[in-house]
């Protein structure tokens, strides 16, 4: 009789435990969030002469690639629809280092910056693990010493930037306010600079971020 009573109590305790787990299993909440990211990126420079120089025997073709590290900040709002899906919209500010060779032969670290708007769809496989996919539309600005022939006088330029992004999310904490993400970005756009003589373009330079991968930490603020 005592054994049966013990089994009954065990079953009740198990049911209560499962109920508590279920109520908090998908506890990720909507709210404002801040994020910090760090990762590696690739950049490519492609220089080519135009038809005018090519036809006069002055053909120029040069391509260089570089890899380095950078950091990013994020601020936005996340809305959770149900236990498996959500959407977030945020502002991002990124700075990526590039090593350049100056005219005197010395190397220096310069950067290009990205300021924009990101939109991600969130899909949770379970309470602690999920995926995301989205797009980042932004403005990109390359340091003048990366592209300018007269960097002391040329003005800083901002151009369009669009990239697809995707990754994995680990969600943790009592109220699921913390997340660590492994992300990857695939840029679609490039920045083209044109160099002219007597009003005629003679050389063009393309600069492009080729990829960006890394880790993010995201903290969501309570809305209650």
Q: Over which residues does each language-model region extend?
A:
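Outer-envelope beta-barrel architecture signal
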Residues: 28-34, 79, 83-87, 127-131, ...
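Outer-membrane beta-barrel translocator domains and adjoining extracellular loop/strand segments
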Residues: 45-56, 99-108, 143-154, 192-201
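Residues that define the transmembrane beta-barrel architecture of outer-membrane proteins
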Residues: 30, 63-71, 107-115, 156-164, ...
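Short glycine/proline- and aromatic-enriched beta-strand/turn motifs that initiate or cap beta-hairpins
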Residues: 26-78, 212, 218-222
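Cleavable N-terminal export/targeting peptides
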Residues: 1-29, 223-224
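Membrane-embedded beta-strand positions of outer-membrane beta-barrel proteins
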Residues: 34-38, 87-91, 117, 131-135, ...
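Predominantly the C-terminal beta-signal and adjacent terminal strand-loop region
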Residues: 47-49, 94, 98, 157-224
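Gram-negative (and chloroplast) outer-membrane scaffold detector with strong preference
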Residues: 42, 65-146
């Amino acid at each position: 009789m005592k054994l049966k009573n013990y089994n009954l109590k065990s079953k009740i305790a198990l049911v209560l435990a499962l109920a508590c787990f279920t109520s908090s299993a998908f506890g990720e909440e909507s709210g404002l969030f801040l994020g910090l990211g760090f990762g590696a990126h690739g950049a490519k420079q492609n220089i080519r002469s135009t038809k005018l120089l090519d036809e006069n025997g002055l053909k120029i073709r040069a391509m260089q690639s570089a890899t380095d590290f950078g950091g990013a900040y994020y601020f936005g709002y996340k809305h959770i629809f149900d236990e498996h899906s959500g959407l977030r919209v945020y502002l991002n500010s990124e700075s990526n280092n590039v090593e350049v060779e100056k005219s005197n032969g010395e190397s220096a670290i310069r950067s290009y910056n990205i300021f924009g708007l990101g939109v991600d769809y969130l899909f949770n496989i379970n309470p602690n693990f999920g995926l995301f996919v989205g797009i980042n539309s932004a403005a990109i600005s390359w340091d003048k010493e990366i592209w300018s022939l007269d960097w002391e006088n040329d003005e800083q330029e901002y151009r369009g930037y669009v990239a697809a992004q995707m990754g994995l999310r680990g969600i943790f904490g009592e109220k699921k306010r913390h997340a660590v993400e492994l992300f990857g970005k695939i840029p679609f756009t490039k920045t083209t600079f044109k160099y002219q003589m007597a009003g005629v373009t003679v050389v063009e330079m393309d600069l492009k971020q080729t990829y960006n991968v890394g880790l993010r930490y995201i903290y969501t603020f309570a809305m209650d």
